[in-house]
Amino acid sequence: MPDAMIREMIPLFKSYGIKKAALFGSVARGQNTPDSDVDLVVSFEKKYDLLDIVGLKQDLEEALQVPFDVITYESLKSGAFADSVYTDERVIYG
């Protein structure tokens, strides 16, 4: 993901109270295609709810014109999926 796109995300991270954000999946591995979405895992500074996650996703998609999947670190459980997120993790904020 180009640095310019990451810089565009930072004001949104600040406005949503994001403590940490990282890419994972094909974009983090550099294997994305034009049809790929951006997989993002975040941690909030404060208590959050589903509306915060959905709002962040929508605002990122509107600002960058690419589809996003947003999950939280808190939602990760042990197992293959969590392992793959941590293996691919490329911290871009926090």
Regions found by a protein language model. Name each.
Residues M1-K20, A28-P34, E45-G94:
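Catalytic core of pol beta-like nucleotidyltransferases
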